[in-house]
Structures are given as C-alpha cells and as structure tokens.
C-alpha cells in the first residue's frame, strides 16, 4: 500500500508551484516551497460516525510536518476530533485555523496557543502564508456574534493562489471575492443539494454545474472538484461536471483527482 504520509514529507516542490493530495471528501494537503497546509482533514473511521465508502488514506499520527491546518466548519467530516488530536501531536508546530464559532469545539482537543479563530474578509498572515477567509453558505450564509460559522480560505503559497471554498452554495459576492484575489486553483464541492437529502438533514453544496459556472465566472485557472465520493447517501457523479464543461465551457481547465493522487500545479509561463 502506498505510504501517502511519507510521499508528502519527501516531495520537493520548487516555486512557483504547489503539490496537492486529495484524501477524499474535502480533505486536501497542499505543499509549497517551505510550507505544508492541510484542509478539512477527515482521517478517522469510528463507530457511530457515518460509514465511509473507503478507509482513510492516511493516519493522522503519520502526518508529520504540517505547518497550517484549516477547518472550514463544525461538521465532523471537516472538523474531526479523532483526526485533530493525533495530528497536533504528529505536527507539533502546526497552527490550526478555523472560524471563531468553532473554537469551543476544540478547546479540549488542541492547545489554545496553536489555534487561530478567523473572521471572514479579515486577512491573516501565518508562517509567511497570506490567508483571506471568505464566507461560506452551507446551505445559507449564517453570521452570528462571532462572525460566519462556515468559511472558505483563499491562500497565497509559493506564488500560487488557491481557494478551498469549504462546504458552500452560491451566494452574492462569492464570484467577486475569487476574482479580486485572482485565484489560480479552485477546490470546490460538487455534490449539490435536493429535496430528498434535505429531508434527511443533509446540508447541500454547489452542484457540478454551479461549480463549473463559478470557475468560469471567477476566471480561475483550474477547477478541482471534490466532496462527491465518500458517503454513499451524499455522492455525485463527477462526470456531470466534465460533461457540462465540455458542452458549454471547453476552454475552462478542470482536473479530476484520483484518491490519494499527487498533482503538481505550476504557474510557470510557457517556455519558462
């Protein structure tokens, strides 16, 4: 079996480029020169949780060397206590970034000095990485006393601007936020929402078509779809996304990531 944790550690990424690994759902590791980020890492499979379609692709205790770990909202497949606790031990220098509304959920799990509460549209700079938190609408914008409880993160790493939307549907202002930051790589959910899943208390996301149209409208250089494969009752066929792009926007780059795939994105000019 492939050792993803070891592969992440030994992969050398020259600037201006980043390496991405997809670990299922919206779980990603992004590595640039001198810094490694984790997004919504969900690497547990405990009784009582919703059954996974496949086992975790890595053990959190093996993921050493992470510098910043993002959790976009409170749902367990995005903020997983059984992942965060061993991850904090394996990567003792990691800083954990999450919406301020999530801070009480990790009070007994993570050292307070290593946790940063984010507010949407209030930029951060951590370990040299520029971070712009943005609202996420899951499945509506919810702003409370501590700000938006669900957020996405735009990061600038090794000359690349990447947006991990978190769980979200479309809302006024999302396109403009992405365009303002000139996003290179957009990671977005495509599992959609519908009446029947809503009746089962499954909170929805962008559909494949909406994710495609968002990428085009925001003029992003590459779309990576996610959040479509892990739970049988909330899955989607990614082929719908590629069919839509092929018919209506054949000029929009989009990359299908296999489970555990390492993908290198480079912004080098042609011939450079």
Model-flagged regions — what are they?
Residues 23-27, 31, 124-184, 202, ...:
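Catalytic core of the metallo-beta-lactamase
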Residues 30, 40, 73, 80, ...:
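Divalent metal-coordination and catalytic microenvironments
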Residues 2-15, 98-160, 244-269:
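Metallo-beta-lactamase
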Residues 45-46, 75-79, 103-106, 122-125, ...:
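Active-site environment of divalent metal-dependent phosphoester hydrolases
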Residues 12-59, 68, 146-166, 185:
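Conserved beta-strand hairpin/beta-sheet module of binuclear metal-dependent hydrolase folds
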Residues 95-97, 101, 169-259:
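Cap/insert and terminal regions of metallo-dependent hydrolase folds
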Residues 57-124:
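Active-site HxH/HxHxD metal-binding segment of metal-dependent hydrolases
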Residues 3, 8-11, 32-74, 81-89, ...:
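Pre-active-site segment of Zn-dependent metallo-hydrolases
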